[in-house]
Amino acid sequence: MKRTIQGMLTLACGIFVMTDQTVWERAASADGTTPSERALATIARKAFLSLWSYTNVFTDEGRHNGKGDGKELCDLLVVFGNSVLLFSDKDCAFPRHSDIKVAWARWYRSAIEKSARQLAGAEKFAKAFPQRIFLDKGCVSLLPIALPDPSVARYYLIAVTRGSHQPARSYFGGGSSGSLMLLTHLYGRDHYEMPFHIGFPLDSRRFVHVLDEVTVGLLLEELDTVPDLVSYLSRKEEFLQQSDLVLSVPGEEELLARYMATTRDEEHAFPNIPSGTNFVALPEGDWDTYATSPQRVAKRKADEISYMWDGLIEHQSSFIRAGTAITAPWQPPGVVDHERIVRALAEQTRLVRRSLSADLRFALMQSESGRMFARIKMTGRPPSQAFVFLTIPRVEGEDYDTIYRTRRIHALTVYCHAVKDAMPTLTEAIGVASEPLSEDMASQDFIYVDLSEMSGNEMKEWRRQADDLEILRPKTEMKLFRDSEQEFPAPFEFAAPPPRYLGVGGRPVNRAERRQAEREQRRCRKKSR
């Protein structure tokens, strides 16, 4: 069934007087109850944007006859379409003990094991009782975003554990980054015997992403959109859970570096492991190589324009949370799913946002009296999604709401439907309409159209309306080009493929042994010259 969703926000020069905040607004501005939770909330809000991230949500477990406080579900909940991210944040001091294994086991139980069990319980509850999650401990305000149906939902469990960084640096020595190592043959209690190594904390082998105080910031700053982060988490789980293969990684940041520097079918990926391999160890130092590379510097510079897109999403979200988002004049406010509109904008990766922002800015710069301007961006191969950026100057004397805005919404609606005639493979269209930047005041209309099903008669009707507006016609001057922008302005490759390391008896080597092996390899190379 074809769906058309429209919404509007208004921007104008002037002073806004804030009234009482809505429950949704208060939830969006909540910062957590501890310093570590506040730190997590800050970086998460930047990456996930405030419409989809909620700190310290609760269930009604423990309440009886409407009395008592609810039970905390998790420290941070992100709900975005079919993706649900559950975060636990624990800041535990590392115990002092002469035996590092004893100290590690105690810290591991309180920081990682406890977090993993909490996250597994939160996932189980959310799937079973999605209508019993609240924004407050009194369980008065329900979560405003509906959780996806369990049959299509994808949950990610993320344990942020603080307190191990400095002890790990001291333990590994030799300039170690101090991040927790990943070792995939460890399960449950196996961890007690391997200080600062993480495999699968849960006996069920349900995957838990364990991040420390350093790697959580690196990860959420490098992959600062929901689709980018979810792709990484999903592919990481696949990479580390390959059957009959043990992987040793000297820290989450090293894994992230390999992911960012490896592409397959124009998407980030992890290195291919040759068939028959039973153990692979990634080298230490890849993150430093990647982080200081001119390619990454150029990427971050090129990404700057993309945050215009984030600003557009966040600004519209503020109206949705406040309950003041406006609908088309002919639409009842209650039938508009404003969240779906802005989610369509937020579903774009950082790279796509870069080009979309450039296209939007170009459209806003166009201003010719009496003429509308449209720029259409299509994504996918073959194209499945169309973005329509439309600017229409106001005509002096016309009423803004009854004439100008109605005219603009009609034109945007026709564009977002009739574009299907020009590209039959399209399944959805997202439109943004505004006055040009040259105007002294501007507002934006947004529209989301599901084009997956459109009958021949519907297509003819939209074609007729497009002809009436003299748009998208065969004789209309259109410029078509393929966007060839690369994420890294220059190709990025590491100097060598990941080496494999095995210690005595086939056991995985630790950081110190790994460095010793690398020094010996360098000496051998020098002697052979």
Predicted regions and their residues:
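Intrinsically disordered, low-complexity Ser/Thr/Pro/Gly-rich regulatory segments
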Residues: 1-74, 78-514, 519-529
